[in-house]
């Protein structure tokens, strides 16, 4: 049984590429479904899987979140234009243990799909919007083997202290210094 409830959208007759698309904070699968349809218009033999977070949103009981934010930013400073960037980064850094645990679950979910579909890491991509983008980046940085790509929309790398503790920061440096 899957760790997450999800919807899957397919193009072509044989799946040779897997895209995991992660919704944002205070969102759900239905909010991002149109993106799957747009992607599949341009990609053959692709399966787009949209898992839904398993935690109810703190802001809206009808929506979901990948991990809690209210207690690390009760005043919602991260949303205020006057908040300095370094303070916003620190707010998201405090989510490290939560995003780390969520990334472990997501990595297990992705690995189980890859095994079931016989899809390799190089043919697996993770996309996300907002909190889903942050999770996508963390997943990409913490997988044992490199993915085909990570495509974040409107997110930052968060949980820096946790990445350092888990020894993943060198992966970021190596990625930034890659040629080609």
Summary of predicted features, one role per range:
Residues 7-10, 152-180:
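The feature captures the conserved acid-bearing segment of alpha/beta-hydrolase catalytic domains
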Residues 33-34, 62, 139-140, 163-165:
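Short amphipathic alpha-helical segments
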Residues 127-132, 136:
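Gly/Ala-rich beta-loop-alpha elbow adjacent to hydrolase catalytic centers
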Residues 138-149:
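Conserved hydrolase catalytic core segment
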Residues 2-119, 123:
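Serine-hydrolase catalytic machinery in alpha/beta-hydrolase-like enzymes
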Residues 20-22, 127, 178-180:
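Short hydrophobic segments within beta-strands
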């Amino acid at each position: 049984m899957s760790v997450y409830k999800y919807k899957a959208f397919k193009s072509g007759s044989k799946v040779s590429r897997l895209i995991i698309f992660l919704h944002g904070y205070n969102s759900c699968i239905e909010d991002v479904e149109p993106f799957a349809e747009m992607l599949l218009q341009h990609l053959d033999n692709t399966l787009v899987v949209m898992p839904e977070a398993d935690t109810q949103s703190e802001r809206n009981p009808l929506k979901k979140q990948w991990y809690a934010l209210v207690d690390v930013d009760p005043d919602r400073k991260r949303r205020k234009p006057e908040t300095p960037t370094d303070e916003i980064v620190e707010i998201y850094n405090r989510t490290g243990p939560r995003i780390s645990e969520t990334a472990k679950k997501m990595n297990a979910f992705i690995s189980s799909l890859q095994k079931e579909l016989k899809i390799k890491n190089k043919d697996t991509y993770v996309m996300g919007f907002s909190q889903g983008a942050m999770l996508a980046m963390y997943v990409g940085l913490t997988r044992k083997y490199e993915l085909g790509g990570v495509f974040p929309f409107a997110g930052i790398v968060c949980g820096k202290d946790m990445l350092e503790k888990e020894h993943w920061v060198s992966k970021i440096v190596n990625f930034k210094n890659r040629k080609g």
